[in-house]
Each structure stands twice: as structure tokens, then as C-alpha cells.
């Protein structure tokens, strides 16, 4: 499914390197390969996962734009395999032009992976009591995504779209996460289903104008390349479920280097959707979402996130990264004063209260009980 939805990180170079490692494991062979930095990191993880004996694993980064004219982050990966029962928990990173001085290091501490092992951050690593979700995926933005001009919906072709607003929802795309609280919208999206592979025929009667609009553009839906749509009901979407219709969400763009978590809600109570390059957790009340947003944007949590994410990755903040945030550990050390400080740093009006924070702690305590 990861391969179908585009979330897998398969790379042919990675496959070749892993084949070489399998071929020469348990020998003193040195393997050196040019590859993307993300591939090098994945190879290091595979060395550990497969319990391959190796003396060292180093990365020598260079400017790929100067050498090859490409924008990818690239390196020379240098692996010293071993015929002895030895393994390193650390991968060191150097500059190719100045290899005598280490730039950084990453690796494992107590079985947990960290992107930066130098510098101090709180240990908020664990399991997130809230489930991080991705937004909707439709691969037909010109038709499904709308803007409003003079009170009329316009699609991506700037055509007027005269449809019911019943299944039209506010949309926040990854590039729109620019404020800690978002409740004004310039984009909207047609959401055709409540859950994956739900039949859509009922829309013909429920929202006839919308059905007619979609039907008039059926050929564009048929041209969607991803095989996930093959055999699915007409105008199907993915990344959709009951969670999509939560009134309050705390979301983040997967692309930003510096993470900003935003409370998402609409003034009319209509659920806010995000695109599939964004991630969010759901809440039943604004107050609980607000507390979570402050915690996640606090300096201590931000520093922790920097220690487990690779900022040169195309998408630094993935579900795998976010689900390591342990709210129980966070609230055990963060005080109301910390939240007030974060509120001030975000230029928000004073809103957080001791009562709200206590209520939030009780809430995640109940969630934790349900999970155990």
C-alpha cells in the first residue's frame, strides 16, 4: 500500500547497495558508493535491522548541484564490513572537502533512532497517544479543489462551478500552515466519501448538481495514474475516514524544515480537510486542540523533533516521526508557565488556563488507560 500511495522510499541505488552488503557480509570488505543522503541513512538502518557485522559506516556529503547539477542531497557512503561480531550504533557525517572534521552523527540510543546525537534535548521519545493521520488524496486537483470568487466556486481551470456546498469542505494544503490558529480559508475541496471505497452512487440523488459536475469531468478521473483507483467507485478518494470529519484538528505540513503545528477549525463548524502531504491529530473541543498545539510548538518539543527528523529530507516530518512524540512524557515536565511562554512567542492572545491544562492531562491519561 505504501508503494501504491507514494509513501514508500524505494530507490534502485539502495537496492544495489543492500545486495552488495548481502554478498560480502561477514568479510572485511569496504563498500563505497555515491548515493542520495536519504539512501545512505536507510542503508545504515538496514545494517542494524539485519544485524550485519560492520566496523564503521560514514557519510561524506558534497554539493551535488555543483558536481552533477542536481538539487538532491548526495554523498559518498563508506561502509567497513567485518568478519567479527561487531556493530556500530553511530553513523558519522563529514564534508567531502574537509573529511578530517566530523559535521554531525546520527544513530541509535537504547534501540531508538535519532537524527542528531550531538546537543541536548528532552527525551520525549515514546508512543503518541493520539493517532496521526494524513489528509485526503484525490489526484484530480483541477476538478476537486475549488476557490471562491464573488461568492461563486471556481475550479482549477477558473471555470464557475455551480454545485451544492453539502460535500464541499475547507481545505488546508501543506503550504498554508503559516499560523498557529487557522480558521479562514481560500481553498475548498469536494469530498465524495466518508470512508475508503464507499459507494458514491448515492451522490446522484443527494447532491445532483455536484454529481453532474463530477460526471462531466469523469474522463479526468479516469486518467489518474495511481493503481489505487482501479476498481474503486466513481470519483473515489483516499486518506478519508471518520477522523476526517473531526471538528478540531492540530495539523502540520510534512515539508517545512521548522515545524509549525496549527489548530484547524471553521467558524461554521464544518470539518477542515488537509491534503495528503499534511498530518493531523483530532480533538472534540477547541480547548484540547489548543493545549496540544501549544505543547507541540513549545521550544522543548521542537528541539526534540529536531533530534529525530532529518531536515534535508523531502518530507522531514512524517507519520513515523510524529508518532514518536509521547504526550505523557511532555506533560510530566511541562508546566502551565511553559505554555503561557509559548503562547506569547506565537503572538497569541492570552487564552490558556490552568483548568484547560489539567483537563488535557486527564484526557490523555484516559486515552493511555484505553491503550493499555
Task: Name every feature range the model reports, one short phrase each.
Residues 121-341, 345, 355-370:
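Polybasic, glycine- and aromatic-enriched phosphate-binding surface used to engage nucleic acids
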Residues 61-63, 351-354:
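Polymerase palm active-site segment centered on the conserved acidic dipeptide of motif C
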Residues 1-152:
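Signature of N6-adenine DNA methyltransferases within the class I
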Amino acid at each position: 500500500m505504501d508503494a501504491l500511495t507514494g509513501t514508500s522510499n524505494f530507490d534502485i541505488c539502495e537496492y544495489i547497495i543492500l545486495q552488495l552488503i548481502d554478498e560480502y557480509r561477514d568479510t572485511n570488505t569496504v563498500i563505497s558508493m555515491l548515493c542520495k543522503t536519504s539512501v545512505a541513512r536507510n542503508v545504515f538502518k538496514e545494517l542494524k535491522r539485519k544485524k550485519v557485522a560492520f566496523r564503521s559506516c560514514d557519510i561524506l556529503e558534497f554539493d551535488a548541484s555543483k558536481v552533477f547539477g542536481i538539487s538532491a542531497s548526495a554523498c559518498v557512503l563508506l561502509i567497513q564490513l567485518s568478519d567479527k561480531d561487531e556493530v556500530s550504533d553511530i553513523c558519522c557525517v563529514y564534508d567531502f572537502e574537509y573529511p578530517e572534521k566530523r559535521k554531525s552523527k546520527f544513530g541509535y540510543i537504547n534501540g531508538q533512532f535519532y537524527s542528531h546525537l550531538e546537543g541536548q534535548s528532552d527525551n520525549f521519545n515514546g508512543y503518541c497517544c493520539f493517532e496521526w493521520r494524513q489528509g485526503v488524496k484525490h489526484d484530480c486537483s483541477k476538478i476537486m479543489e475549488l476557490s471562491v470568487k464573488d461568492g461563486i466556486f471556481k475550479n482549477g481551470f477558473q471555470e464557475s462551478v455551480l454545485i451544492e456546498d453539502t460535500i464541499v469542505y475547507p481545505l488546508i494544503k501543506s503550504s498554508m500552515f503559516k499560523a498557529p490558529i487557522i480558521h479562514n480559508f481560500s481553498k475548498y475541496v469536494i469530498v465524495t466519501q466518508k470512508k475508503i471505497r464507499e459507494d458514491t452512487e448515492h451522490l446522484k440523488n443527494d447532491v445532483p448538481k455536484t454529481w453532474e459536475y463530477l460526471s462531466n469531468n469523469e474522463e479526468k478521473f479516469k486518467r489518474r495514474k495511481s493503481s489505487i483507483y482501479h476498481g474503486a467507485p466513481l470519483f473515489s478518494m483516499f486518506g478519508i475516514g471518520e477522523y476526517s470529519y473531526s471538528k478540531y484538528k492540530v495539523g502540520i505540513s510534512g515539508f517545512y524544515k521548522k515545524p509549525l503545528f496549527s489548530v484547524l477549525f471553521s467558524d461554521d463548524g464544518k470539518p477542515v480537510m488537509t491534503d495528503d502531504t499534511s498530518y493531523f491529530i483530532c480533538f472534540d473541543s477547541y480547548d484540547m486542540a489548543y493545549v496540544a498545539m501549544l505543547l507541540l510548538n513549545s521550544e522543548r518539543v521542537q528541539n526534540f523533533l529536531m533530534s529525530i527528523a532529518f531536515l534535508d529530507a523531502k518530507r522531514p516530518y512524517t507519520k513515523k516521526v510524529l508518532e514518536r512524540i509521547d504526550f505523557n512524557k511532555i506533560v510530566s515536565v511541562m508546566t502551565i508557565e511553559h505554555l503561557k511562554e509559548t503562547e506569547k512567542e506565537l503572538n497569541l492572545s492570552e487564552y490558556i488556563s490552568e483548568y484547560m491544562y489539567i483537563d488535557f492531562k486527564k484526557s490523555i491519561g484516559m486515552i493511555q488507560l484505553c491503550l493499555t
